[in-house]
């Protein structure tokens, strides 16, 4: 069964700049035309060389703002700030959420760090980010989302990511603890929508990526996520006038070649996911014939944010 609406699919390779092996895998996917867009983690160990690769191959690139892993970019925040722990690192994926819930994060410092990351992005790439999302979805957290929206508007960055995946709760392969974390992300993201709209920020109609990370990525899972998302979207907009028959989707991906324990990361060394075969698995799925054939059969147009 083919899909009725015209589909524009942005396939984003996250964590570009995390390590050379990751970067090589993402660039290989771009050359294979299965990744259309990358998100640069600016405090990553290979951020400068990754930016050079993007310039060399004309890869559409945005900023993967990072407030949860490694060192801050802003010099004045590296010694004494609410964003770092006693080792000088960001508080981590769960740590930043705990600090936020306790009211211990200084939002003026969040603003300084986001602005410093945009400034460094401009220095490395020679351009403004074409879009801006975040590492571990911190940009939709309460308090941070308001600052994030203001910073994007001030820097004229028009696109971001809203990590709400329709049909996520149907995915029985996701462990309960991880599903609870995803539910929290989606709740925060839904509460972010009006804030981002107020600041003129846009995002694709649909998002896919939570149900298809790492070993959970398969051509079938991506196809089903697209089908379910598009059908749900069609039923939502069917009563609205003057809606054209097209839908935009972002597929968040993390392809690459596994890193070694000695390389990569954002100052603390690479995480387990970076060193696992899950990265290679995603790369192989994205380049697989079944997925390519699905896109071809359904007229899916792979594109970048600049094409939306």
UniProtKB/Swiss-Prot annotation:
GO MF entries: deacetylase activity; hydrolase activity; magnesium ion binding
EC annotation from Swiss-Prot or TrEMBL: 3.5.1.-
Keyword flag Magnesium: yes
One protein family per Pfam: YdjC
Entry's Gene Ontology BP terms: carbohydrate metabolic process
Active site: 14
Keywords from the UniProt entry: Carbohydrate metabolism, Hydrolase, Magnesium, Metal-binding
Co-factor requirement: Mg(2+)
Sequence intervals crossing the membrane: none
Disulfide partners: none
InterPro entries: Glyco_hydro/deAcase_b/a-brl, YdjC-like
Annotated positions binding Mg(2+): 15, 135
Top-level class of the enzyme under EC nomenclature: hydrolase
Highest taxon above the source species: Eukaryota
Family the entry assigns: Belongs to the YdjC deacetylase family.
Biological role stated in the UniProt entry: Probably catalyzes the deacetylation of acetylated carbohydrates an important step in the degradation of oligosaccharides.
Protein name: Carbohydrate deacetylase
Name of the coding gene: ydjc
């Amino acid at each position: 069964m083919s899909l009725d609406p015209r589909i524009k699919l942005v396939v984003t390779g996250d964590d570009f700049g995390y390590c050379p092996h990751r970067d090589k895998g993402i660039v290989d996917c771009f050359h294979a035309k299965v990744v259309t867009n990358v998100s640069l983690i600016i405090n990553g160990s290979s951020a400068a060389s990754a930016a050079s690769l993007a310039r060399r191959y004309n890869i559409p690139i945005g900023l993967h703002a990072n407030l949860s892993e490694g060192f801050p970019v802003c010099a004045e925040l590296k010694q004494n700030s609410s964003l770092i722990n006693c080792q000088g690192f960001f508080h981590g994926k769960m740590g930043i959420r705990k600090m936020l819930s306790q009211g211990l994060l200084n939002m003026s410092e969040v603003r300084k760090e986001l602005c410093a990351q945009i400034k460094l992005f401009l220095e490395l790439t020679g351009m403004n980010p074409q879009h801006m999302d975040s590492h571990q979805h911190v940009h939709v957290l309460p308090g941070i989302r308001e600052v994030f929206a203001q910073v994007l508007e001030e820097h004229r960055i028009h696109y971001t990511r809203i990590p709400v995946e329709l049909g996520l709760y149907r995915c029985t392969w996701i462990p309960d603890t991880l599903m609870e974390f995803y539910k929290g992300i989606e709740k925060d993201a839904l509460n972010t929508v009006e804030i981002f709209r107020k600041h003129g920020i846009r995002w694709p109609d649909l998002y896919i990526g939570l149900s298809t990370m790492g070993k959970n990525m398969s051509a079938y899972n991506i196809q089903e996520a697209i089908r379910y998302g598009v059908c749900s979207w069609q039923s939502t907009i069917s009563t609205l006038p003057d809606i054209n028959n097209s839908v935009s989707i972002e597929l968040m991906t993390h392809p690459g070649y596994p890193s070694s324990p000695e390389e990569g990361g954002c100052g603390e060394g690479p995480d387990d996911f970076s060193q696992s075969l899950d990265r290679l698995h995603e790369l192989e799925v994205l380049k697989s014939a079944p997925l390519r054939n699905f896109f071809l059969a359904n007229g899916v147009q792979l594109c970048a944010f600049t094409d939306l």
